[in-house]
A protein has these predicted regions:
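Phosphate-backbone recognition surface of nucleic-acid-processing proteins
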Residues: 209-285, 289
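Gly/Thr-rich phosphate-binding beta-strand-loop-beta motif of the actin/hexokinase/Hsp70
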Residues: 1-21, 107, 139, 208
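Low-complexity, acidic/Ser/Thr- and charged residue-rich accessory regions of DNA metabolism proteins
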Residues: 241-242, 278-321
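Short glycine-rich phosphate-binding loop at a beta-alpha junction
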Residues: 52-63
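Long, charge-rich intrinsically disordered scaffolds of nucleic-acid metabolism proteins
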Residues: 2, 69, 79-198
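Nucleic-acid-processing active sites and adjacent nucleic-acid-binding tracks
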Residues: 24-54
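Small-residue hinge/turn detector
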Residues: 203-204, 226
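Amphipathic, charged-and-aliphatic alpha-helical interface segments
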Residues: 170-183, 187, 204-218, 259-265
């Protein structure tokens, strides 16, 4: 356990519940989750003569990003941890009450006892790419919704829906080009893109997501951490001889990154030589199709991490094993 001040932050869409621990004593503060709230938080820390506490928060959707980037830009060490870690820590502490204030204090206790590694903020180019990728995903989801509506719509509204679909098609096409131009215009992103593009089965959308959400050695110490970040790590449920549940994907992690790996996993398993070898090996071992798909999603992230770390393109002899 360290003795430096720690600041646990429970993040929600509209507010940040903060718990500051200094020499074993806790102080609480609630601020809005916007630029003014971040400034208020800094002023509150200065009021208590705390200039550089170790800040810890959960990776809750996208709501944590702005506050983490603001605090890191003001030279505060920030750790962003998987919510599953805090949940497990709370279970070990027998915490039964769940409120935002209690969660903030629990996060502070976790930071104090576990001293998690500092989070590395994304570069401006990565931040811009992330915004573009998230916008593209929103447009594609909107397109799917409108297409489903059109199939059952009454004649009175069909033209309006069709016009909206045509507009969405143009926006998606333009945004897809903007994403590619953005990657091509940044030397670091372009180099990483070309390495990821060497992996059979991985397409432009998946490459953009991996680069946008920092699923790389720049932000994680190893591939296992990267897989856990995406929520692709298997979760075992076993106890004694009476409880022996099947391993399942944890899904505690970045949903958009996980979603973008599903179709590439299918393509790789059925349309590439190395993917077919992987599929046949697991099928012969008696693994069901759903498990094989999840395993390939994890494998793709492991391979992506490997080519980025080594700086060498995909090698079927090395990565296909």
């Amino acid at each position: 356990m360290n003795n430096i001040p720690v600041l646990g932050i429970d993040v929600s869409k509209d507010k940040l519940d903060c718990a500051l621990c200094v020499e074993g004593k806790y102080k609480s503060k609630v601020v809005t989750n916007n630029a003014q709230g971040f400034t208020d938080l800094l002023n509150w820390l200065h009021k208590w003569h705390v200039d550089s506490p170790h800040v810890c928060m959960e990776a809750t959707g996208v709501y944590w990003e702005a506050s983490a980037e603001f605090l890191a830009a003001h030279n505060l060490p920030v750790s962003v941890v998987n919510p599953a870690q805090i949940k497990a820590f709370g279970g070990s502490r027998l915490v039964r009450t769940k409120t935002d204030a209690v969660d903030a204090r629990l996060i502070a206790e976790f930071c104090l006892r576990m001293t998690p590694e500092a989070w590395q903020p994304p570069s401006p180019a990565e931040q811009a790419l992330r915004a573009l990728v998230q916008r593209l995903d929103a447009l594609q989801r909107m397109h799917t919704q409108e297409r489903n509506r059109l199939s059952v719509a009454r004649e009175a509204v069909r033209k309006g829906i069709a016009d909206h679909l045509a507009w969405l098609d143009k926006e998606i096409e333009a945004l897809t080009k903007q994403i590619r131009d953005h990657i091509d215009g940044d030397s670091d992103l372009k180099q990483k893109h070309d390495l990821l593009d060497s992996i059979p089965g991985v397409g432009e959308r998946t490459i953009a997501a991996i680069l946008a959400f920092g699923a790389s050695p720049d932000h994680f110490a190893n591939a296992r951490q990267c897989v856990a970040f995406a929520g692709l790590n298997p979760r075992q449920h076993q106890s004694g001889s009476s409880v022996n549940g099947k391993p399942r994907m944890s899904k505690v992690g970045h949903a958009l990154l996980r979603k973008t790996l599903y179709m590439p996993a299918m393509v790789t398993l059925y349309n590439t030589a190395w993917g077919k070898v992987f599929r046949n090996r697991l099928a012969l071992a008696g693994k069901p199709p759903k498990l094989i798909i999840g395993a390939m999603m994890r494998k793709l992230l492991h391979v992506a991490f490997g080519v980025l770390k080594s700086g060498q393109p995909f090698n079927p002899a090395l990565h296909g094993a």
